[in-house]
UniProtKB/Swiss-Prot annotation:
Protein name: Meiosis regulator and mRNA stability factor 1
Subcellular location: Peroxisome
Matching PROSITE patterns: HTH_OST, RRM
Modified positions (Phosphoserine) in chain numbering: 65, 1081, 1083, 1684
Length: 1730
């Protein structure tokens, strides 16, 4: 009958009982229980003779005082005045007498009662007491009103009312202190608690009158009664026979006027409070009495007894009676689960033993085992004494935190060997047998297990020993086990809503003390010594002294508090100091916190990261802060919103450390509550315990996001609302100290916040959930360091990291990851979390070597979140056959896939995800059935019905059985599944159009309720649409089974009986507008080994005819193709078919039986065709192909005939339509369809960014071995190398391959099977190699290296071997010939030696090229070859770029990007042009050539430039703000000298050479018309001479003037008037370096400018000057007269080059030295007419 009780919840208020005149005798008054000398009770005459000479049942000294301060943990709530219900106040006698209640019989005899023992109908061993004699005894000072009998009462189910204590085996077992009476016509009266219902009354009709409402019940949280059998409100009438009579229990002495209150461990409680749910938490108490101040230490006046539970007041007559019980009994702590019975020894309680199979019913991972133990004790231990509490497990395999919590709870943990079979069960069975031998009935056994092996022991304990058996089991318990238990309870009730384990102790953080009123006239060292002596015994350290204040640091809060007491008001050099935890001013606080550890840390960055406990006085707290101890801040794991209020980890460290001072307040019950800045009535308030995160978080959000919320929060109305609404946030992770500041949603700080809008789930949690767990960072904190400079040696790098991190705390270890692909990382382990946070905040982006390291916290394998481990485990096991893997294979796959070690003990914590089973000689990791269904790769947003199908072509679904054929259309009516031979099935090959076939299949599925068996599909199709076009030649068709899977939304599933069924993917037709690609599955494979295997399968099947291969031929074909064996066990499988089915996104198995075929899936075929099509289109010159010519183009590109069935379809259009529109473009030209690559026109900015990207690619690949890298490594390597993402849209592309193909001059993409390799082009490779050779040779002694040592030194320097074949050479000598611009080979005695060549200065060459380009008239591009020719003509020396370190002149010009622009036209011709800035410089040079000495005042430059060029000078068009900045940007042309207004713009000497564009750029002479030019401006003192000059042969105007003036007397030149507008000449000598010559014959050899025809004025004849042989000769125009012989002179005998080097350097040297030798050369302005 146990556990079968029913409930009838009541809701109507029950009033006070009144004893009217017609009231029945059992309705007795409360005051009638006590006799007084002045008042004779109505029944005293009838009971007096039975109350003599009887021993007292309860001594007054055993009754504790109900008004004891310790017993009143919470004061009672105010109650309404009930004086009208009390009897007149009378003086009680010293020895009170108690009369029998109305339940006692009226006749002279009463039935005897058993007291103090028995239970059940058989009674117990208690003494027999006659109530009459007991109450009549004048010498007793006892209160022994007993109500009810000793019969067992029917209990309410403990599952429904766990905390109600009405499940009485016997009255003496639960309430042995209550006196019991027996009355045959009795009625069981129960309180109006809502959980109980009125039982049947005896045969007499009892009438309950309308009662007043019970204020006490309402305040205590009771639910009033409502349903009465009679239907009348407030009345109850029932008739019952004597056979239905049950004993009655008056449960509330105050409400039902039955018995005095029951004393529980020294506190006074009525029965209603005993039946209430247990108050195990202060949270519930705070919820019931939210506004009650802390209890007063003054004892309350003992006027009226009040129930400590519900607060109901009793009669004043009870005062003296209850006062008599307060004889010094010390009250126990409130909330103890045991029922303390006055005058009874604990050993008389029945024993109870708990036996816990913790391996079978385990504590959920990360949850508190303390709470589970507490819940077990609270539920079962009332009225019992704990005799045994044991759990059995392997302590080496169980979580250490769980074992520690069990030990702390005084639970016996028995260790067994987990590898031994049934070791835990055997140990528990032994403990059960010992318990039965030790204890006798009545006793209770609680077994926490689901193992059926305990059925035998439970049967014996219940039926042979008479024990009460309680079984706590899981859902999967066996009926054989459940049958032997008296009471069944699900284990999930104990583990539901378990709080997470939190660290047992918070890591210590430093605490600051601020010292004020220090003497200002003393030096800091003396004050520091004095303060150190005062604080040394408390572990203090003086951080800084500023003015009259100082800061001291202590290791924890306790030391700081002790130091504050000792140092307060101490004398320091005559001043009484003041010590405080908080600074006086905010500015002082900010200043000191930034200089807290200045003596240790010098860097300003590191100073900011001091971990300190910053403590505020209570006076600075907000008035809304409310004391609420016992709360724990917990955050929901579902929220990942990062708050914007926490700026850095340093702030988090400060806020976390603030909890240090508040811990003591929490212990005293004065915790602080941070109110949310929310003005709404639904504002929630997180409660903080031991963490200082929430308060600063919301305080900062109040200041930053809601400035107006401060006054709102401080309002009394809002304070009350916030105090009444209390929530908690649950943090399941042990990393909650860091996540707390990140996962609190910003919505919490919004004024319109509501619980529905918040992403956080707020739950009221049991305070026991706050039980701390061991610190997850007790063994150290791992810090991950990335972006490490891989150029440093490992030893050097390890030392640098050790030094950097040791400045912030103790470094336990520094580990470097393997040096692969230059992705070098480091793991630094520090001692505690605080030091790690400070190190992360300080060293993030700290430069070590040549890179800025990236630092972040890493929990590592030991601290990895179990939820993440569960997800990773599921992803691996879901790809495994039967979702199981051997443990060693699972560990190997896990570590290869995720790159870190796996702690096997963590796997045992995933009890809700996996199961580890012993099998044979090893362990097997299996996924539980509830987690085996793979989630849809499309996601819930793309899935039509939320199906978990993975959309693979071959799918095992929940089809337990399916008919092998369609009975309606199958042609073979005699088909039998038993007779059918799978090997006889022949796969049909069809030739159909997919566009026609797809709607037919959907229609066929519609008529067949969504499924069609594959065997009868041809028959069903023929019945609907006619016969299929089946071909007998398998090479000319497509397998029907594969062709069906090409239809979007249709799949072929395999039922569990092996029948293949055609069905819809989502069990219904797809929507009409669904993208076909959404119906294709993504790769479900996550195992790197399987990914590699899938690539190998694709590569193998591509070589097979029609991409079809029999399964039986796979192994030999694999061996023949790859030259290696295919070991199935290497992938974790035992059968080949299981391995093939593990890659369903790539491989499709066709047919059945032993003749199965394998082919590529349609998804893989489309991907393969797309790659081939793009390759074909890129091979075309026009990047397009006509469909009509597709076969021919395919043959030219791939050297094989086109066969569309190779790609699994029958029509080209079918597979082209599967390619996304973003990849190719189909267009119609005339009557033909054209396929082309879709390209988007890129903007000019994107083109410029692509050019910069090409430079990045060169830089990246130069750091890779052999200047190449895999394609799939490019993105991570780019991110790691440059510290930024490679965003394709930034360059105008959508695919990485397209971006890389856009720089063909830099990068090549090589295809090696399925893999793509990126490598530099040949030109870029040689550039990179040249840079390596320069670096290598410069590191050698003498910048040279023996040729034989080249390979060895190269490998030592760069870490990989040198390969000659990469450069298409066979020897080092041939290689050096290609690097002749960098190295040269010298023959030495010891052998050939490689040496660096001496490069010429590029600066002088740059100036010479600039002069050439600026002297050329025009803005158009100039061919590079012509520029070379003009250079060689001008300077009479070949231009060899190798001498300057470049292979070609184009590369040399590209190295000058700010001077010139180089471009290439469609004919691959290279042109060069000045940049816009140097076009401006060209104009400046021309302008300055018109001035004396090529200089001009700066303030006159703009006006002169405007007049000369004809346009206004705008510096902003060139990117500069002023003319001075603009001129400063062309230092190769001009420079500015002087100061203030006298600043002068001067032309550089290199730019003073004036070369005529007609003279220099004489190209294609025969194609250019003759042009004549005259010199018109000459001085008046001379005759005007007309000089006819041919194109390209005349000098510049200045040179002509100089030549003409040279023939005159120098006196005329010196005597010519100087214009007054010209500035004063600044004479400075231009030294002439004379070559060795015959100075005596100086006058006999006048120098004439070469290449110039001087016309004699008289003869008008041409005088050709000789030209050096080998240079370009000047052709005479057809209109010119015949050339006359040259005048006699040595010039005709000794010809000179066309332009001498001296002539180029200085225009003054071009003057013929004929008559006068000037002391210095001067620059001349053009001679103008005065």
């Amino acid at each position: 009958m146990e556990g079968k009780g029913t409930e009838n919840p009541c809701s109507r208020t029950l009033g006070w009982f009144h004893q009217d005149n017609d009231a029945k005798p059992w309705l007795w008054k409360f005051s009638g229980c006590f006799s007084r000398p002045e008042q004779t009770l109505p029944l005293s005459s009838q009971t007096k003779e039975y109350m003599e000479n009887k021993k007292a049942a309860v001594e007054l000294k055993d009754i504790p005082s109900p008004l004891h301060v310790g017993s009143k943990f919470f004061p009672a709530v105010p109650l309404p005045d009930i004086r009208s219900l009390q009897q007149p106040k009378v003086q009680l006698s010293a020895i009170p007498k108690v009369s029998c209640c109305a339940h006692c019989p009226n006749e002279p005899s009463t039935s005897p009662m058993r007291f103090g023992g028995g239970s059940g109908s058989s009674g117990g061993s208690g003494s027999l007491i006659h109530t009459g004699s007991l109450l009549d005894s004048p010498s007793t000072g006892t209160v022994t009103c007993q109500v009810g009998s000793g019969f067992a009462f029917q209990s309410v189910s403990s599952l429904q009312n766990a905390s109600t204590r009405n499940n009485l085996v016997g009255l003496s077992s639960d309430f042995p202190s209550m006196c019991v009476e027996s009355n045959l016509p009795s009625c069981k009266h129960l309180s109006c608690c809502g959980k109980l219902h009125f039982q049947s009354c005896h045969s007499n009709v009892h009438k309950l009158h309308q009662f007043q409402n019970l204020q006490g019940c309402a305040s205590a949280g009771y639910f009033p009664c409502s349903d009465f059998p009679s239907g009348a409100p407030g009345h109850l009438e029932e008739r019952l026979s004597h056979s239905e009579l049950t004993p009655h229990l008056c449960t509330n002495s105050l409400h039902l006027n039955v018995a005095p209150p029951v004393c529980l461990k020294g506190s006074l409680y009525c029965e209603d409070c005993l039946n209430k749910p247990a108050r195990n938490s202060i949270i519930d108490a705070a919820k019931i009495w939210p506004n009650i101040p802390p209890p007063s230490t003054q004892p309350a006046p003992p006027a009226i007894p009040v129930c400590n539970g519900c607060g109901t007041k009793g009669m004043e007559k009870e005062t003296s009676l209850l006062l008599a019980t307060s004889l010094g009994k010390t009250a126990s702590k409130f909330g103890s689960p045991e029922v303390a019975v006055t005058g009874q020894v604990l050993e008389t309680l029945p024993p109870i033993g708990v036996f816990w199979d913790i391996e079978n019913c385990s504590v959920p991972s990360g949850r508190s085992a303390t709470t589970v133990v507490q819940r077990i004790r609270e539920k079962f231990f009332r009225g019992h004494r704990e005799a045994e509490f044991i759990c059995v497990c392997d302590i080496s395999k169980e979580n250490k935190e769980v074992i520690q919590e069990l030990n702390n709870c005084q639970v016996t943990v028995a260790h067994i060997n987990a590898t031994a079979k049934n070791a835990a069960d055997d140990k528990l069975r032994q403990s059960l047998r010992r318990f039965a031998n030790t204890h006798t009935a009545p006793a209770t056994v609680v077994l926490v297990s689901t193992d059926v092996n305990f059925a035998l022991e439970l049967s014996d304990l219940r039926h042979r020993h008479g024990f009460h058996i309680i079984l706590v089991h899981k859902n999967q318990a066996s009926e054989a086990l459940l049958h032997h238990a008296n009471q069944l309870i699900r284990f999930e009730e104990f583990i539901s809503d378990l709080p997470p384990r939190l660290p047992l102790k918070i890591p210590q953080c430093h605490t600051l003390l601020y010292v004020y009123n220090l003497p200002a006239n003393k030096d800091g060292k003396s004050i520091s010594n004095r303060l150190r002596r005062l604080s040394d015994n408390c572990g203090g350290k003086v951080l800084s002294i500023t003015g009259c204040s100082a800061i001291l640091r202590f290791i924890n809060q306790d030391s700081a508090e002790r130091a504050q007491k000792r140092m307060e008001n101490e004398d320091v050099f005559g001043n009484r100091i003041i010590v405080s935890f908080t600074p006086k001013h905010r500015e002082f606080f900010e200043a000191k916190s930034s200089n807290a550890i200045a003596d240790k840390v010098k860097s300003p960055k590191k100073v900011k990261n001091t971990k300190l406990c910053l403590i505020k006085d209570t006076s600075e707290q907000s008035p809304s802060v409310k004391a609420m101890p016992g709360k724990v801040l917990q955050a929901n794991s579902g929220s990942a919103t990062k708050t914007t209020n926490i700026k850095s980890l340093q702030e988090l460290c400060r806020m976390e450390s603030k909890s240090g001072n508040r811990n003591s307040d929490h212990q005293q019950g004065h915790g602080r509550l941070a109110a949310l800045p929310n003005s709404g009535p639904t504002a929630s308030v997180p409660i903080v315990k031991n963490t200082g995160v929430t308060e600063p978080l919301y305080r900062s959000s109040q200041k930053k996001e809601n400035p107006s919320s401060q006054s709102t929060v401080n309002s009394p109305v809002e304070k009350k609302k916030r105090e009444e609404t209390v929530f908690q946030v649950s943090y399941p992770s042990a990393f909650s100290k860091l996540i707390a500041s990140r996962q609190v949603s910003p919505l919490l700080t919004s004024q319109s916040w509501s619980p529905r809008a918040s992403p956080l789930a707020f739950n009221i949690a049991n305070p026991s959930s706050g039980a701390d767990c061991p610190d997850p960072f007790a063994n150290g904190v791992d810090i991950q360091v990335s972006n490490v400079d891989y150029r440093l040696s490992r030893k050097e790098l390890q030392q640098l990291l050790q030094e950097a991190f040791s400045k912030h705390g103790q470094v336990k270890s520094v580990e470097l990851s393997p040096h692969t692909d230059y992705q070098l990382k480091a793991i630094v382990q520090m001692r505690n979390l605080h030091e790690a946070i400070c190190a992360v905040n300080s060293l993030h982006r700290h430069k070590i070597g040549s890179k800025k390291i990236l630092v972040s916290l890493s929990t590592g394998a030991a601290n990895k979140s179990l939820s993440l481990l569960s997800t990773e485990t599921m992803s691996i096991l879901q790809d495994a056959p039967a979702c199981c893997l051997p443990l060693f294979k699972f560990i190997d796959i896990y570590e290869k896939k995720y790159g870190h070690k796996l702690n096997v003990s963590d796997l045992y914590k995933l009890t809700d995800t996996i199961a580890i089973r012993e099998q044979g000689n090893g362990r097997l990791v299996c996924l539980l059935p509830s987690n085996q269904a793979r989630q849809s790769p499309l996601g819930s947003s793309q899935s039509h019905d939320g199906s978990s199908s993975n959309c693979s072509p071959v799918l095992f679904e929940e089809l337990e059985y399916h008919e092998p054929v369609c009975k309606q259309h199958c042609s073979n009516k005699d088909f039998s599944e038993l007779v059918f031979d799978p090997d006889s099935y022949k796969i049909p090959f069809v030739v159909l159009s997919l566009k026609v076939f797809a709607p037919q299949v959907h229609s066929l599925l519609q008529t067949h309720q969504g499924t069609v068996p594959l065997l009868s599909f041809p028959d069903c199709y023929a019945a609907e649409f006619g016969d299929l076009e089946i071909t007998q030649d398998s090479h000319k068709g497509v397998p029907l089974e594969h062709f069906i899977t090409c239809i979007p939304g249709v799949n072929i599933a395999t039922a569990q009986n092996g029948v293949k069924v055609v069905k819809w993917i989502h069990n219904k037709p797809p929507p009409p507008n669904t993208d076909p690609w959404l119906l294709r599955s993504k790769s479900p494979v996550r195992n790197p080994q399987l990914i590699q295997f899938s690539r190998e399968v694709i590569d193998l099947l591509k070589t097979q005819p029609s991409c079809i291969l029999p399964v039986s031929n796979f192994i030999p074909s694999y061996h023949h193709h790859f030259g290696k064996q295919c070991r199935v066990s290497d992938y974790g499988y035992s059968k080949l078919i299981e391995l093939l089915e593990a890659v369903p996104h790539v491989l499709q198995i066709l047919g059945m039986g032993s003749k199965r075929l394998m082919t590529l899936t349609h998804r893989a075929q489309v991907k393969r065709f797309t790659q081939d099509l793009l390759k074909l289109l890129k091979s075309q010159a026009s990047k397009q192909v006509i469909v009509r010519d597709f076969s021919q183009a395919y043959h030219w590109c791939f050297s094989k005939d086109w066969d569309v069935t190779e790609y699994g379809v029958c029509d080209l259009i079918d597979i082209i339509s599967e390619i996304p529109d973003t990849t190719i473009c189909l267009s119609q030209q005339d009557d033909d369809m054209v396929i082309c690559i879709r390209k988007r026109e890129r903007t000019q900015d994107e083109i410029e960014r692509t050019k910069q990207f090409s430079k990045d690619v060169v830089d990246l690949l130069r750091h890779q071995p052999h200047f190449r890298m895999p394609f799939n490594k490019f993105i991570p390597s780019y991110h790691h190398h440059f510290g930024r993402q490679c965003k394709l849209a930034y360059y105008g592309f959508t695919k990485l391959l397209e971006l890389l193909e856009a720089i063909p001059e830099i990068l090549q993409v090589l295809e090696c099977g399925e893999e793509k390799i990126l490598t530099l082009t040949e030109v870029e490779r040689f550039k990179a190699l040249a840079a390596q050779f320069v670096k290598l040779l410069r590191s050698q002694k003498g910048n040279c290296l023996m040729m034989t040592d080249l390979f060895t030194e190269y490998a030592k320097t760069f870490g990989y071997t040198f390969r000659l074949q990469d450069y298409d050479v066979s020897s080092v000598s041939a290689l050096t010939q290609k690097l002749c611009h960098v190295v040269k080979v010298a023959d030495m005695e010891s052998g050939k030696q490689i040496q660096l060549i001496n490069r010429k200065s590029l600066r002088s060459l740059t100036a010479q090229l600039l002069v050439l380009l600026m002297s050329w008239e025009g803005d158009a591009y100039l061919p590079v070859d012509e520029l070379r020719r003009h250079y060689e003509t001008t300077h009479s020396t070949p231009l060899n770029p190798c001498e300057y370190g470049f292979m070609t002149l184009t590369e040399l010009l590209k190295s000058l990007p700010y001077l010139v622009e180089v471009c290439t036209n469609d004919k691959a011709e290279e042109y060069v042009k000045l940049t816009s800035l140097y076009l401006f410089a060209k104009n400046v040079r021309s302008l300055l050539h018109t001035y004396h000495y090529q200089q001009i005042f700066l303030h006159e430059f703009s006006m002169a430039y405007n007049k000369y060029v004809g346009e206004t000078l705008q510096p902003k068009t060139y990117g500069y703000s002023s003319v001075e900045e603009l001129l400063g940007a062309i230092p190769q042309v001009v420079w500015i000298k002087g100061h203030g207004h006298k600043r002068i713009v001067v032309l550089k000497n290199d730019m003073k050479n004036r070369l005529s564009s007609f003279d220099l750029f004489s190209v294609n002479h025969e194609d250019q018309p003759a042009v004549s030019r005259q010199i018109l401006a000459v001085p008046e003192s001379h005759l005007a001479s007309e000089l006819q000059l041919r194109t390209g042969t005349g000098p510049s105007q200045m040179e002509q003037e100089l030549l003409h003036l040279a023939s005159s007397s120098p006196v005329d030149l010196l005597c010519a008037p100087v214009p007054s507008c010209l500035p004063s000449p600044q004479l400075r000598p231009d030294p002439v370096i004379l070559k060795p010559a015959d100075l005596i014959q100086f006058e006999e050899h006048p120098q004439e400018p070469l290449g110039v025809l001087v016309l004699n004025q008289e003869e008008k004849s041409e005088v050709p000057l000789p030209v050096q042989k080998g240079n370009l000769s000047c052709d005479s125009s057809p209109s010119s007269p015949a050339a006359s012989p040259a005048p006699p002179g040595p010039s005709s005998e000794a010809p000179r080059p066309l332009f001498s080097k001296d002539a180029v350097e200085s225009p003054a040297k071009k003057q013929p030295k004929n008559r006068v030798k000037l002391a210095a050369n001067f620059s001349f302005a053009p001679v103008t007419k005065l």
